[in-house]
Structure formats: structure tokens, C-alpha cells
Amino acid sequence: MAAGKSTIGKKLARKLGVKFYDVDDMVVTEHGPVSDIFYAQGEQQFRKYEYEAICKALDSEPGIIALGGGAVTYDESLKVLKKRAYRVFVKVPPEQILGRLRRSHTVRPLIGATPSLSKIKELYTARMPRYSHSDYVVEAQDMSTAQVVDQIAQWLHKKNIKL
């Protein structure tokens, strides 16, 4: 949630010369705006669409996949990601997320039009057990996008992970 996953993912994919997949964009292309799906069909249906998009990306050519912040809350998504992908958590503190959300023009369905630190912390706390099981965690609080991209690329190289 507002950790910069899409921006980082695009830049990392470009640096590595691989394809980039944005799961939210894939869902929007197939089913319409995220907020419309949440309001008309509910979060559970959105998570199913998200899972389908994740599977489609995993079945395509290798690359970088940017997930929505809540993707790993859906058990099937987490299961397939654990089995078929390397998972990187870009860890940004809730206060920084709040600042980013306040500057954003996108309304996040689980946060609402007026983001609050308490709501962000509530979601963050609920999701943290799933985030913390990532293969790699980037403590990104004081890092630029370029630094985060470089750190992930270095980790991939060190682990001899080829995409």
C-alpha cells in the first residue's frame, strides 16, 4: 500500500531487461476500476480477480510482478506466490505511507477518501505477518527509488537468481 511497488517494479524490470506486470493494472483492464469492483462486488471478488491476474503473470514470460498491498491476504494468491515466485517486501513506515496517500489522487477502497494513520496502522499490522515471510525485505524508509531498485538487483545477483 503506497510503498512504491509499481514504480520500483517498472524500474527494476527495465534494469534487468525483463517484462513488468502490474496486477492492479491487469485487473482494471479485465474488470474495470479497482474501487468499482470493491464497491459493487466486494473485496473477496476483487481478491479472486487479483489471483487470476497473478496466475496469468506467472504463466507468462519471466519478469517483475507488482502486487497490490492486500494481495497476500488472499490465501490462494499467497500460496501460488510462495510456490512460484521470489517475494520482496518493500517496507515503508505507516507515517510515510500516509504522506504518500494524502498526495495521491487515487482513493484506496480500504482506506477511503481521507486516509488516517490509525487506519493505515490497522491494515499494516494485520498484513505484517504475511509480509514478513517474504524472501527479502527492503527497509526502504530513507531510500530513494533508485536505491531500492539497486538493493533488490544486488540481492537477486547475490542469490544467483536469473529471471
Regions found by a protein language model. Name each.
Residues R14-V23:
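Post-Walker A helix-loop "phosphate-sensing" segment adjacent to the P-loop in P-loop NTPases
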Residues R84-M128:
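A glycine- and Lys/Arg-enriched "phosphate-lid" helix/loop adjacent to the NTP-binding pocket
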Residues M1:
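The conserved Walker
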Residues G69-V72, P93-E95, M143:
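Short glycine-rich anion-binding loops that position phosphate/pyrophosphate groups of nucleotides
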Residues K11, K15, T125-L163:
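NTP-dependent small-molecule kinase module
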Residues D22-A71, E76-K82, P109:
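ATP-dependent small-molecule kinase phosphotransfer cores
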Residues S6:
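Walker A/P-loop
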